[in-house]
Amino acid sequence: MFAALIAAAITTPPPGVPVVQASLPNARPALYVVNDEDTIIYLFGTFHALDGKSEWFNDEVRTAFRGSQELVLETLVPEHLKKPRAPRQPQAFGMQPVGRFAGSASFLSTSKAVMSAGRSKGMSTAHGADTVLRDAADDAGMPVAGLETFEFQLGMFSKLPGADMPKDAAVAARTNAALAGLMAQLQAAWNRGDIEQFAPMLDQMETRSPEIYRMMFDERNGRWAQWIARRLQQPGVVFVAVGAGHLAGKDSVQHKLGQYGIRTARVN
């Protein structure tokens, strides 16, 4: 069950409107770099929903971002879905309730449970790293691109098996509390740049739900590494930001890049 919950927790939800706070403690989330003679590609691991209680867009991360000519995210959420009041139902994605998500009601239920657990810890996509970066790029007039189309992500989610959420109120409450605690632990690890804290979770996911792991991590990380390898053939500076879980474990983007003979270095 928890494998599907975690899968939902570290994928890209629709972003909200960022709220800027001052005098927050510094965080140092992991930043990597790939480069050759005329190309620099930064690889940043994001946390899609944060509590806004740390300042992470600073130091090496901000310097790398400001020196980049393009931001590349996992996907670009359509503008009409970025509105705070946009309904988060299948209709909001241009589909009927009984459509591409018809076979994944359980997965949608799981996703709602994950969002609820995150909210209980004050986490919101309004503070998420992807949202902050996208808004900063828009403000700076920086081009923004996606590694995947939004339609591809919807199709992927529609194929993922979900977990049957407990119907008993007491059991559901314990499940929510456990998930909220885990999300808080992962956020803390992200804040301190401890990317390998995500690896045991990924190992558990691969063991319990190999199909989810294959679709969401192994295959996508391979495609993204291939994209980076191709992009190195063009000059320029690019800031690539993907979920931190994709930079951890034996099938990380860095590991996939190594299969192309491409070395990844930690910046911070």
Protein language model annotation of sequence segments:
Residues 16-216:
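Structured, acidic catalytic/metal-binding patches in enzyme active sites
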Residues 1-2, 130:
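Generic alpha-helix initiation/capping and coil-helix boundary signal
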Residues 12-14:
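Intrinsically disordered, low-complexity proline-rich regions
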